[in-house]
Regions:
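Extended, low-hydrophobicity, polar/charged segments
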Residues: 2-185
């Protein structure tokens, strides 16, 4: 597929497909790189020095991530978004645990539900499976699973389903301004 130079409606620098003259969509690789870069910039602005590692076979699930990294599944940070009324709340949960929705609702003092994919994307700017613990579209109230504190190092998503980064749990709590609360089982 050829590419036209930017002219007319593409003067902003966008490129067009020669056959259709429609704007060319960015590749998924470019979007993934942008997501990682956006996360990395936000993490460093929050005081975290991150070293993102990419795994082509994916780290979408906690088990996938643990296998790729070579750690225990409990050292994987699951970033789960819940809706508390109309406000999104982020729960950073140990990979081998599940959020106890009754405990979370009790802690938040309101009814909750797991957020849908479009709500996660709107609140965080990232897709499910690659949602990092910070760098979101809107500031999120964050709840951190105390079981993550049992480890010297944990691994969290870095913006894409194939990227993770290591972090000390105490640094994660500080960077996210998270509340360490027992809402898992």
């Amino acid at each position: 597929m050829g590419v036209l130079e930017s002219v007319g409606p593409f003067a902003s620098g966008a490129q067009a497909d020669v056959r259709t003259r429609e704007p060319r969509r960015r590749s998924s690789i470019a979007r993934r790189s942008d997501a990682i870069e956006r996360f990395t910039e936000e993490a460093e602005a929050s005081g975290l020095q991150v070293e993102v590692q990419r795994y082509p076979d994916g780290t979408r699930t906690a088990a996938d991530a643990a296998a790729a990294v070579g750690c225990h599944v409990d050292q994987i940070v699951k970033s789960l978004v819940f809706m508390a009324d109309v406000r999104p709340v982020l729960v950073l949960c140990s990979g081998g645990r599940r959020v106890d929705e009754e405990r979370l609702a009790s802690y938040l003092g309101t009814e909750i539900r797991i957020a849908g994919a479009s709500e996660v994307r709107a609140a965080t700017g990232f897709a499910i499976g690659g949602t990092p613990p910070l760098g979101h579209t809107v500031p999120l109230r964050t709840v951190v699973d105390p079981h993550l504190m049992d480890f010297d190092e944990v691994w969290a998503a870095a913006g894409t389903p194939d990227s993770v980064f290591p972090v000390k749990p105490k640094d994660l709590v500080q960077a996210t301004a998270g509340a360490v609360v027992g809402v898992t089982r």
